[in-house]
């Protein structure tokens, strides 16, 4: 992929608003970090996003460029976006992995309840969130 193509992929991040859109919070555990923000799109496509932060810091709403990214997917690509929060800090392993897998299970139930597509699901994340997205894919529950 050439440099121009890569730059063009970033344009939505600069155009989209970084305001927090209206969302519904869905709990999947007892800890306050064990929550998912759901942003309703106008199609049945689904994006599941897991924030980064080196397993030590961060939050599903803390990264400004991530808010722009999600807003773009909700407002312009019409995705339904689920943003996963998980336990972080000194005792994050194995809690972060377990939390994200539990959150994914909860999201699958939400997808069914909201009659969204099980065929159009993207699971992604930044940094530690990318690792956790990969762990969902490698989970025995989803092979």
Give the location of each predicted region:
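N-terminal cap/lid segment of alpha/beta-hydrolase-fold proteins
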Residues: 14-42
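Short beta-to-alpha linker loops that shape the active-site pocket of alpha/beta-hydrolase fold enzymes
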Residues: 53, 85-89
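Short beta-strand element of the alpha/beta-hydrolase
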Residues: 44-54
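Primarily recognizes the serine-hydrolase "nucleophile elbow" in alpha/beta-hydrolase
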Residues: 102-143
């Amino acid at each position: 992929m050439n440099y121009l193509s890569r730059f063009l992929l970033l344009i939505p991040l600069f155009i989209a608003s970084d305001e927090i859109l209206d969302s519904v919070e869905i709990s999947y555990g007892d800890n306050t970090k064990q929550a998912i923000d759901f942003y309703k799109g106008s199609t049945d496509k689904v994006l599941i996003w897991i924030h980064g932060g080196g397993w030590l810091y961060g939050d599903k709403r803390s990264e400004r460029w991530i808010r722009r990214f999600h807003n773009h997917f909700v407002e312009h690509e019409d995705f339904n976006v689920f943003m996963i929060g998980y336990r972080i800090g000194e005792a994050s392993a194995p809690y972060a992995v377990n939390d994200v897998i539990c959150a994914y299970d909860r999201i699958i139930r939400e997808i069914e309840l909201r009659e969204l597509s099980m065929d159009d699901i993207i699971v992604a994340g930044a940094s530690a969130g990318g690792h956790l997205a990969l762990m969902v894919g490698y989970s025995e529950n989803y092979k």
